[in-house]
Amino acid sequence: MAHATSSAYEVKITLPGNLTRDEEDRLRCLTGTILMAPSLRRCLFLHDVDRNSYYVHGSEPDYATSLAAYRRRFPLLVTAVGRQELSAVSLSIGCPKGLNFRNTGPFQLLNGSNVSLIPPIGGRWRVELLSCGSVIEPAMTIPTEVGSELLGKILAGMTYEFCARNQIPADRPAEVYRVACDNKALDLTQAIRGGDSDLQDTMKTLFASVLFAMNEGVLQVMTLMPALLAGGNTNPFLNALLQMQSATRLSAQIFNPPTLPVHDPTGGARRYNVFDAFASWLTMSHRLGELFHMKPALKVVMFYSDVSAIDEGQTANAIVP
């Protein structure tokens, strides 16, 4: 059974009173799994962590939206399941020790592996409670090193789906729908193929963000570093770039244009808009990088066990890194 010391931040999740005996039994499989809470309080209700809590304006979110919600939520490790409540500990604050969690992902977790959390793909650990209309879906545990490839393939697959639904010709490789690790593969079809409106909104936002970041980055380099195109530099790497004999560099070297001041488009003298735009570009680039960066939530530590690999459904000791 999952357990933790009193130094952990303990949370009680109240269960509805009209659950059937069969539903109570099925809830017991949640022991050792991780639920994501929108806020951190000592007492929560089941509807705070069920699938409906991720809905946006009454519609089910796509995978990218669920992933963004995971970044804002707090992971709770379920330590015990009672008749009236779930006992859990927070992995975000406090000093939980002696943790025991369940591997809810398809990949093996090795001793010393960092473990990240993503929205579930497939219904392997889904618990449907018809009596109260709730669906509980624990987070999927995956090795942190697999996370970046998995997220990249999900977004690439969503891009292909976006092109297909908008009659944009594009070749779709079969490998975009699966990610493999240690001779085990995970099918990403369910995460990639969402609703039409959700996919349209998500991909348009993603494309706009990427294009804006690329355009702003080039604009800042051209504005703040005109000497890079016109003159030399003592840095060997920059000299190698300047010796590429591009048409832009040659024309700038011949004419040697003066550096022109960039005025504030609003006409005010309170700020220099190029530096504000540069700061905004750095912020957006950082956020795009954060989308693909998986932070570890747990680290597998098997002190007194001969087992070195934890398969799906098995439990393992862990610490918070």
Swiss-Prot record:
Q: Name one GO cellular component term.
A: host cell nucleus
Residues of the signal peptide: none
Give GO terms: molecular function aspect only. structural molecule activity
Q: Where in the cell is it found?
A: Virion; Host nucleus
Its main subcellular localisation, reduced to a broad class, is virion
What is one Pfam family matched by this protein? Herpes_V23
Keyword terms? Capsid protein, Host nucleus, Virion
How is the subunit organization of this protein annotated in UniProt?
Interacts with TRX1 and major capisd protein/MCP.
Question: Which family does the similarity line name?
Answer: Belongs to the herpesviridae TRX2 protein family.
Q: What is this protein called?
A: Triplex capsid protein 2
The encoding gene: TRX2
